[in-house]
């Protein structure tokens, strides 16, 4: 990529229909893990006008009220009025869970290459990424896209902008100069709203109360603001679009700044490497950058179903590494256990922590639940590299 360019990332709020689905799926997962931490869960959700469908595969000893979990999640998000697109009190909830296939279970429970360790729940490839564009070691565009819709939710909930409704989207286009963020070129923010507010009022409030308090002032240089560019956004949420689990995988990760292996996260227990190995790859990449070994780090891992050890662990630093990428990859394999069971133990993943991850990004959030955001291995990596 050239050193001078524009790059765009987007995010969506907790009230976006796909994120409603993600949060219900992860709320189901959390409720099960709270009772049965070794459960096998693949919980999918569809939500439309007045309807929620729960399907997938679950094998557990837990006793869970799935219908109530779906309603409680919709209520927490803020859909408590039929005018908003769905109402937690009146929506229909259909439950259609099966058990995990025994053919899959036998490979997960006992790895073909390591009797003592859990095999991967499926084949697949996963990526982790980190860079020094923000203190959280995330790409600038996706980090601030998340913060914009997060603030929209805050102002909706605390009543400062009472005409806001739960559904919203943001998009941030950043101008890079010499490969580094220089300024914000364009901000798009679309927010669902009550019908009794004018476009002019929405535009002024969004720019002054949401955008400017979030984005660094020094980055706002001739920035273009596109606020509700269609002119009206009253119909939203699951009424405006059908929501499905796993349809916001770029929002969930790095906003397009890194490749994606294709596997979604929400609703999946940690035996699914789509989720756990992607978290581990972020953990690795963040520690590499935090150690000073590179300014950018992309990590790819891949697995075969029923096999514990990753097929490959590949590191790419885009020319920013202090030592060769192959040497960094060797250090990674020495300092991180990337077998599925090793990942679960390393990151303490058998906890009911996942509903919080299902909106505003799985990465770049330094909260206690996000163990994969720790940089506790940076010093050891730096020492091992001789820096």
From Swiss-Prot:
Binding site for Mg(2+): 18
Top enzyme category: transferase
Enzyme Commission number(s) of this protein: 2.5.1.6
UniProt-annotated binding residues for K(+): 44
Binding positions for L-methionine per the UniProt entry: 57, 100, 241, 272
Keywords: ATP-binding, Cytoplasm, Magnesium, Metal-binding, Nucleotide-binding, One-carbon metabolism, Potassium, Transferase
CDD domains (UniProt xref): S-AdoMet_synt
Cofactor(s) named in the record: Mg(2+); K(+)
Start and end residues of each stretch annotated as Flexible loop: 100-110
Pathway field: Amino-acid biosynthesis; S-adenosyl-L-methionine biosynthesis; S-adenosyl-L-methionine from L-methionine: step 1/1
Subcellular location: Cytoplasm
GO cellular component terms attached to this protein's record: cytoplasm
Keyword Nucleotide-binding carried by entry: yes
Cofactor remark from the record: Binds 2 divalent ions per subunit.
MF-aspect GO terms: ATP binding; magnesium ion binding; methionine adenosyltransferase activity
InterPro entries: ADOMET_SYNTHASE_CS, S-AdoMet_synt_C, S-AdoMet_synt_central, S-AdoMet_synt_N, S-AdoMet_synthetase, S-AdoMet_synthetase_sfam
One biological process term in Gene Ontology: one-carbon metabolic process
Pfam family, one: S-AdoMet_synt_N
Reaction(s) catalysed (UniProt annotation): L-methionine + ATP + H2O = S-adenosyl-L-methionine + phosphate + diphosphate
Keyword Membrane: no
Binding site for ATP: 16, 167-169, 232-233, 241, 247-248, 264, 268
UniProt subunit comment: Homotetramer; dimer of dimers.
Family in the record: Belongs to the AdoMet synthase family.
Chain's role: Catalyzes the formation of S-adenosylmethionine (AdoMet) from methionine and ATP. The overall synthetic reaction is composed of two sequential steps, AdoMet formation and the subsequent tripolyphosphate hydrolysis which occurs prior to release of AdoMet from the enzyme.
Name listed for the protein in its UniProt record: S-adenosylmethionine synthase
Taxonomic lineage: Bacteria, Pseudomonadati, Pseudomonadota, Betaproteobacteria, Burkholderiales
């Amino acid at each position: 990529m050239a050193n001078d360019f524009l790059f765009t990332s987007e995010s969506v709020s907790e009230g976006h229909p796909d994120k409603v689905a993600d949060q219900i799926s992860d709320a189901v997962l959390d409720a099960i893990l709270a009772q049965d931490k070794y459960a096998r869960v693949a919980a999918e959700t569809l939500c439309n006008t007045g309807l929620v469908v729960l399907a997938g595969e679950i094998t557990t000893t837990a006793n869970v009220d799935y219908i109530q979990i779906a309603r409680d999640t919709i209520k927490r998000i803020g859909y408590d009025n039929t005018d908003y697109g769905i109402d937690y009190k009146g929506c229909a909830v259909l439950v259609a869970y099966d058990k995990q296939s025994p053919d899959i279970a036998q490979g997960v429970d006992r790895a073909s290459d390591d009797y003592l360790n859990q095999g991967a729940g499926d084949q697949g490839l996963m990526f982790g990424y980190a860079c020094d564009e923000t203190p959280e070691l995330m790409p600038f565009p996706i980090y601030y896209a998340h913060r914009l819709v997060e603030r929209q939710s805050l102002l909706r909930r605390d009543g400062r902008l009472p005409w806001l409704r739960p559904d919203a989207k943001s998009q941030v286009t950043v101008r890079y100069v010499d490969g580094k963020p220089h300024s914000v070129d364009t901000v798009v923010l679309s927010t669902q709203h009550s019908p009794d507010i004018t476009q002019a009022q929405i535009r002024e409030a969004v720019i002054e109360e949401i955008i400017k308090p979030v984005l660094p002032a020094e980055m706002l240089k001739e920035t273009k603001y596109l606020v509700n560019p269609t002119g009206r956004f009253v119909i939203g949420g699951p009424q405006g679009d059908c929501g499905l689990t796993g349809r916001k995988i770029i929002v969930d990760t790095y906003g397009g700044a890194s490749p994606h292996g294709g596997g979604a996260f929400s609703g999946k227990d940690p035996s699914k490497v789509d989720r756990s190995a992607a978290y581990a790859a972020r953990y690795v990449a963040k520690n590499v950058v935090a150690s000073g070994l590179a300014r950018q780090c992309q990590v790819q891992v891949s697995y075969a179903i029923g096999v514990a050890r990753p097929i490959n662990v590949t590191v790419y630093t885009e020319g920013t590494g202090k030592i060769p990428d192959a040497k960094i990859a060797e250090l990674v394999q020495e300092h991180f256990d990337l077998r599925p069971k090793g990942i679960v133990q390393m990151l303490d993943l058998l906890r009911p922590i996942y509903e919080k991850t299902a909106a505003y990004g799985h990465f770049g959030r330094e909260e206690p639940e996000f163990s994969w955001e720790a940089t506790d291995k940076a010093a050891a990596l730096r020492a091992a590299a001789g820096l």
